[in-house]
């Protein structure tokens, strides 16, 4: 950070991989959202504090709707979207069912509370996959898909309420 101090960056974003366990790649580790103590031995809050001390806004990457194959969340079938009773899987990812109260509590803790408690003022939210033609849990697959899209938008509102003033990039 010292080396870029005089460059007029407004925001410094810690990108994908901040949660990286030592045994897998960043893409397959999404979903558990536990900060890496290897990458951030003093904790990610210390990194955010250092960013702000250099006069920049601290930002963090999230893809809050998915669980990668190597995460514990990938196997938490009661929290995941399904189609025809089978967890909806796209390559190495599954999707959280954002309609469920347990998932809402999980995302609140892992994303919203985490961002607020660690002093992040900016979040970069990727949506690198999609659920296709829909999911179970409604009168049709399409209606299930519509409900999930609507719930994703509600999460942006929840995020703004949980972290006042946060800038959201998508």
Report each predicted region and the residues it spans.
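Short, solvent-exposed loop/turn and secondary-structure capping segments
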Residues: 24-25, 63, 69-73
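N-terminal substrate-binding region of glycoside hydrolase catalytic domains
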Residues: 13, 18-39
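Hydrophobic faces of well-ordered beta-strands that scaffold small-molecule active sites
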Residues: 10-14, 58-62, 123-125, 169-170
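Extracytoplasmic/secreted cell-surface and envelope-processing proteins
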Residues: 22, 70, 132-134
């Amino acid at each position: 950070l010292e080396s870029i101090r005089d460059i007029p960056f407004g925001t410094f974003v810690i990108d994908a991989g901040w949660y990286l366990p030592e045994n897998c790649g960043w893409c397959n580790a999404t979903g558990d959202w536990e900060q890496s103590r290897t990458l951030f031995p003093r904790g990610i809050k210390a990194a955010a504090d250092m960013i702000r001390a250099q006069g920049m806004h601290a930002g963090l990457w999230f893809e809050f709707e998915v669980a990668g194959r190597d995460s514990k969340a990938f196997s938490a079938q009661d929290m995941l979207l399904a189609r025809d009773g089978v967890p909806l899987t796209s390559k190495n990812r599954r999707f959280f069912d954002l309609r469920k109260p347990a998932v809402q509590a999980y995302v609140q803790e892992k994303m919203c509370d985490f961002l607020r408690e660690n002093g992040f003022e900016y979040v970069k939210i990727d949506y690198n996959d999609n659920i296709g033609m829909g999911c179970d849990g409604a009168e049709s697959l399409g209606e299930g898909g519509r409900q999930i899209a609507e719930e994703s938008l509600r999460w942006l509102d929840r995020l703004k309420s949980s972290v006042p003033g946060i800038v959201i990039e998508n």
